[in-house]
């Protein structure tokens, strides 16, 4: 497979959301939909395009006038710009958004863009073939939940054949991962230790899909 993705969306349980479906406004796009901002956290298109976004850590200041980060993904899926050009374009406009981590793939390449409004420069990186774990801390944050997930995915992908159920076992794991001091992760919620699991259940917040 050119691309294998196993992912969860962690969000407030009461945030209105539609599960993955082909959008009637853009029938080539398969994605979930956030019904507040009308964007998406992850999706694919029939043109072989893929996009996914996570919010930056809670320690980064936010501003109310920011454009919804869910538009970062859907605009790429709807468009024809290459992943590299789109990522470069966003890099110059990243201060219009609150902190984010963005994955973009077209049929020829895959790119990662990390942006924090407090930084003078965003991070733009082409991803070579490999296994990557993305969290709210970024693609190279070293979060233990990501390292554990990467290890499990590596074991699955080394097999000649695997089932979707194998991927589901990875993202449905509720085991808590060992954690460094929470201050180093930029986390603030009282339930932060619970967020170390692949499948999060923390009061009013947790894994939605």
Give the residues covered by each predicted segment.
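N-terminal nucleophile
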Residues: 1-209
């Amino acid at each position: 497979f050119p691309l294998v993705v196993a992912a969860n969306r962690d969000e407030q349980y009461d945030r209105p959301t539609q599960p993955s479906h082909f959008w009637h406004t853009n029938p080539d796009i398969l994605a979930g939909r956030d019904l507040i901002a009308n964007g998406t956290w992850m999706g694919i298109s029939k043109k072989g395009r893929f996009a996914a976004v996570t919010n930056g850590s809670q320690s980064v200041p936010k501003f109310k006038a920011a454009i919804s980060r869910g538009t970062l993904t859907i605009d790429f899926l709807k468009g024809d710009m290459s992943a590299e050009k789109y990522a470069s374009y966003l890099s110059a406009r990243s201060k219009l958004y609150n902190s984010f981590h963005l994955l973009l793939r077209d049929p020829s390449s895959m790119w990662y863009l990390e942006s924090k409004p407090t930084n003078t420069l965003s991070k733009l990186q082409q991803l070579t073939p490999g296994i990557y774990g993305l969290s709210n801390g970024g693609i190279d944050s070293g979060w233990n939940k990501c390292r554990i997930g990467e290890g499990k995915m590596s074991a699955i992908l080394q097999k000649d054949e695997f089932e979707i159920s194998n991927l589901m076992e990875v993202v449905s794991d509720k085991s808590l991962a060992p954690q460094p001091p929470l201050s180093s992760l930029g986390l603030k919620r009282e339930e932060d230790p619970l967020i170390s699991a692949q499948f999060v259940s923390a009061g009013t917040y947790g894994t939605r899909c």
